[in-house]
Amino acid sequence: MKLFYYIIPFFLCFVHTAQGEENDTTNLRQVELDEVIIQSFKQRRDLRLEPLSASSVTGTAIENRNITGIKEFSSFIPNLFMPDYGSKLTSPVYIRGIGSKINSPSVGLYVDGIPYFEKSAFDFDFNEVDRIEVLRGPQGTLYGRNTMGGIINVYTKSPLKYEGTNIRLSNGNYGNRNYALSHYKKIGEKFGYAISGDFQNSDGYFTNLFTDKKADDMKSGSARIRLEWKPGKNLSLGLMSSFDRSNQGGYPYAVCDSATHTPGEVNYNDYSFYKRTLSTTGFSADYQGNGYSINSRTAFQYISDHQGIDQDFSPQSIYFARQDMKQRMFSEEVNIKSTTSGRYKWLFGA
């Protein structure tokens, strides 16, 4: 009798499974994803074959979303967060929770293969960006220091692949204005140049009761030139130079009421500000050999910024902080890597 009780549930499960298989008429749609190639200075491979988590955003998507800086990527790039602390000076980037608000960054930033070592240079105006890649996870093996959280690669449009003139004008409330102009020209098949510039303005959102003026107004402008030359079939040379100037008002900070835990009004007497001058120049050389390539990146970056902040956040003159910084950074990197489609690849560099 006990054996009979064990056999009946077995057959019931078999019949139920068979009926489920017969009644399942679901058709699953299979979609072949488009090929995405990592264009990094360190590597060039199909993103689908890479053992890492990455996101790639095209220039069209950037324009459609009206993205003007890295901070705005936080809304749709997984595991990427760049908080806004009130000025471009404090611009930490966090990937998977790894980042640094002070000292050296934990996420690396490269623009056309040129490294940006200082966090205060991360928050710059996007203009004519062709593509952005976010590589999540430690990248120290290929990129070295300050890449524990990941890497952000920004690529601008190439004058050898794109020609024309673009004009962008936008206006909004609170005095928000954005004007941009760019021109791309190819001379023959071997030389091309690109010139672009933009201006952004914001009258601010918070009023300082002491001065009766906006506390967080902002004006910024940038200019950029890019030259590309292919003197031979296997040799490519490039020169990039950019200049960025930002002038921001102070921080819309207010004293918090410890009893009600509510913020008070912005009301302080000393004028607060952040002013930054950023200049970056880079030279690139790439040679494609038979099964290998030799690549070089030379860069120089100059940063000069000035910060003043009323840190008592009150109408009284108690504590005012001033910070000035000037940095000159030079970098040189050369690598040689395999370009074959074999199972194994190699790379050497310094």
Set out the residue ranges of the language-model regions.
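Extracytoplasmic beta-strand/coil segments of soluble accessory domains associated
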Residues: 71-114, 130
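Short acidic/polar hinge/loop motifs at secondary-structure boundaries
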Residues: 112-138
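Transmembrane beta-barrel wall of Gram-negative outer-membrane proteins
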Residues: 164, 171-202, 210-248, 277-281, ...
